[in-house]
Amino acid sequence: MPWHPVSFFLCFFVFVPQRLYLYTHKILYTMKYYFYSLIVIALLLTASVSIHASKKLKGEASCRTTNTETILHVWCWSFNTIRENMKSIADAGFTMVQTSPANHCFIGDGGGKQIMGNGKWYYHYQPLDWTIGNYQMGTRDEFIAMCAEAKKYGVRVIVDVLPNHTAFDTSAVAQGLRDAVGGIDNLYHANGLVEIKDYNDRLQCTTSGVGGLPDVNTENPDFQYYYMQYVADLIRCGAGGFRYDTAKHIGLPSDPLDPKSKKNDFWPVAMGMKSVKGFRLENRDQLFIYGEVLQDRNVKEKEYSKYMGLTASNYGHEIRQIISKRKATSAEVADWQHSVSATKLTTWVESHDTYCNANESATLTDTQIRLGWVIITARQNGTPLFFSRPDGSTRENFWGNNLIGPKGNDEFRNPEVVAVNKFRKEMDGEKEYIGTAADGSVVAIGRGDKGMAIVNLSQQEVALSIATKMADGTYTDAVHGTVFTAADGILTATLAPETSYVIK
């Protein structure tokens, strides 16, 4: 029977759309169900990964980025002493040496060379001129000879430089420096002879005197040019990098201006980003440079990091707390406590300042310092610095033989120090994971499935049982001959008190 026009209209425009709607609605509902199901599954999977993956901490680098260098701070060693011990330094696995300041400095106590007493270690932190050579460290020729010896062993020389201030005795400042900057008044900031009262006030912090030391007008182009000639000479003589003392006391472009300054451009000039009077630092990317930017309130860490690496002072304090209380959590060990990428941090257990100023770290034993060193050096990032304590020093006699010039004690070549230095280089490219014993007495730093460094912080023997990624089997520590067994993701061994181990 032929379709009536009305029937055709009702079927095509009413019933068919209804059926299509019902089918379409059903399809959309089904798709919606599967869509939300997929979201739930994805969330569950993500949660599972988060539980098992290491938490990304502030300052952490990407998993394939590693630092392999190590620095020996040859504190108060003369250039000749460093040269004579270069083979031992290289054999100990150190890739860099950091010297004390090489510039002409204040001569106090009649030229005495005791670290503290008839002479002072901090006199070489009081410049009178920016030329190479001083009575404590040695001559320019001796510096050149030291650098040549370092090159022979593949060791980079880092020089401690300090453009921020001069000696207290401004009358002793070299005439050549005075003339270069247009007179002594042009050498200092407007309030450069006034001591800082509030270290968190950036104008005071960067233009007044640290501890009362006269604050140099580092924005004066004449000074910048003079200082950069010193840097260039150090490089010509063989230096491969610098540690900038009191770096946070030199202003950044965003800091308030001193009345004598037109712009805060010291760091762009010092890092070769900008020329001064026709001079520009070349090959900046071939130099290792970091600044002493001690952490505190209102310190512009990220802005400083645009120019150089930075010190991880808070992390150093945390490590000293760990070795003092002899307990740690993996979170305490892992957190760099810094806003800057860990690849740009210089780390330490102690520095010359923590040792000398109020002797904050000087009461820690050499063994405790060594245990802390193994922890920071086994890690994937940061560039660790080992402070060479005075030879003959004890926890009752911090200055030991008390002489500027001779080498420090032999801890830098302790077998445990050597083992972890070499482990660090061998683990290049291996991602770290950190574990601790249930009671916190043991810290383990794993690097991929290639090796582990284990530290027993306690003063008792410990039966170790800790997670590992190493393949099943037995591993023998090269220093102590201790046998470790890995089975089903668990590493076991018996650890001696206050001892570190490296297995691979």
Where are these regions (language model features)?
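Hydrophobic alpha-helical signal peptides and transmembrane signal-/tail-anchor segments
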Residues: 5-24
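Positively charged n-region of N-terminal signal peptides that target proteins for export
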Residues: 26, 31-35
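Bacterial N-terminal signal peptides
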Residues: 38-46
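Sec/Tat signal peptide C-region and signal peptidase I cleavage site
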Residues: 50-52
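Active-site-proximal helices and loops of the catalytic beta/alpha 8
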Residues: 54-70, 83-90, 101-125, 144-159, ...
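Aromatic- and acidic-residue-enriched carbohydrate-binding clefts of CAZyme catalytic domains
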Residues: 65-69, 105-143, 183-214
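Active-site mouth loops of central-metabolism enzymes
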Residues: 72-79, 213-224
